[in-house]
Regions:
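Extracytoplasmic/secreted cell-surface and envelope-processing proteins
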Residues: 36-39, 67-68, 92-95, 163-165
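Accessory recognition modules or surfaces
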Residues: 9, 13-24, 65-78
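Structural transition elements
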Residues: 1-15, 34-39
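Bilobed periplasmic-binding protein-like "clamshell/Venus-flytrap" ligand-binding domains
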Residues: 19-35, 76-86, 129-165
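Hydrophobic, well-ordered secondary-structure elements that form the walls
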Residues: 28, 48, 69, 99, ...
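Periplasmic binding protein-like
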Residues: 47-102, 137-138
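Short, polar/charged alpha-helical segment
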Residues: 10, 38-51
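Short, solvent-exposed loop/beta-turn-alpha elements that line the ligand-binding surface or hinge
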Residues: 1-10, 71-76, 97-127, 156-185
Length: 185
């Protein structure tokens, strides 16, 4: 999959023109109160503008993003076009658990992507028991997701973990777990 997600503003501009984009502003919701998300929207806005979009970045707290993202109204009536969020590794470990790969139309998450082929691939992955075949299906899911863009992964980060020397038994996991912990003297 090397090279599939390489940034190319000139090519993006050409594709946008070819698609018939008319310059209608794209409403990008910008969460301002969660540190992990705060800087993402301004970067996305810059990249989208380099691609040729007119972007209306609207800043709000996360609770407002959460409430608004459930609205299906058009952007000029209080709706939206894009927002950024983050997931822990356990939520995106495979095509079935990755909620934003759900392309089941009205049953999908916010944005309501609708793609029967992507849904079939996710079902195939869930039913397959051979790890080698699952891997091939997962790669097909990734390629289809790039074609249909139900989500656009923008990166990964490692959340630092620190604790005092007297904390023992902490389990390093994809998400914080607080069992098996004890304090020693």
């Amino acid at each position: 999959m090397d090279g599939l997600l390489t940034s190319n503003a000139k090519k993006a501009q050409e594709l946008l023109k070819e698609a018939g984009y008319d310059g209608t502003p794209v409403v990008l919701m910008h969460s301002t109160d969660l540190k992990v998300l705060t800087n993402l929207a301004p970067v996305a806005k810059s990249l989208m503008e380099k691609a040729g979009f007119k972007v209306d970045m609207q800043s709000m707290d996360w609770q407002s993003v959460v409430a608004r993202r459930a609205k299906k109204d058009p952007p000029n009536a209080g709706g939206w076009n894009a927002f950024l969020t983050a997931w822990v590794a356990a939520d995106v470990m495979n095509p079935v658990s990755t909620a934003y790969l759900n392309a089941a139309c009205e049953k999908a998450l916010f944005g309501w992507p609708c793609d029967a082929q992507l849904e079939k691939l996710r079902d195939d992955f869930a039913r397959e028991v051979d790890p080698a075949k699952q891997k091939a299906i997962a790669e097909a899911v990734q390629l289809r997701a790039i074609e249909t863009t139900p989500e656009i992964p923008v990166g990964e980060y490692v959340q630092p973990v620190a604790m005092r020397k007297n904390v023992k038994g902490f389990v390093i996991a994809p998400a914080p777990v607080f069992w098996n912990i004890e304090l020693t003297k």
